[in-house]
Amino acid sequence: MGTLRFFILLFFSVSIVSAQEYSTILWKAQDKLTWKDFRGRVPVPSRAAATTASGFTYKYSAQRIRGELKVSFAVSTYFYPEKSWYNPSLCDSIILSHEQLHFDISELYARKLKKKLDSKTFTHGSLKKEVKFIYNAVMKELNDYQNLYDKETNFSRDLEEQLRWNKKIREALK
């Protein structure tokens, strides 16, 4: 029946904004955030020291070859500078490290999404629905994990826990 090729390109993001509307910083192991990357306005009133807006997007292409659906995925993690902010009077290097780890955790879950998507066999009729289901499940896990991180470190105030989390995530990203 020949090779029927079709390509689907979808972008989803943790953030409400798309990567095309705002500048983004792509996650790279060797690059670390600086306070200059946090360009959003501090909301009034806010008792928080800083907020990191990060997340991941995915895209995929699919081909039907001899009746079999072959799907290829790409997942990327982004930091959104205009949606991230800090209060200079409350921030120090420990808080910056805490915010960096939020970005790193997003990368960790982007990798989990990629692994889950790559290990799944899809059918043409259910591809979009199944991908979205997996994405939503991983997003829930990510949000729960980010909340656990903040809770256990007390938003970076518990230095011992912060150091434990730094090591834990660094090891997970190796």
Task: Describe each PLM feature range.
Residues 78-113:
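Mid-length scaffold segments of soluble, non-membrane domains
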Residues 115-125:
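Functional transmembrane or membrane-interface alpha-helices that line membrane-embedded catalytic
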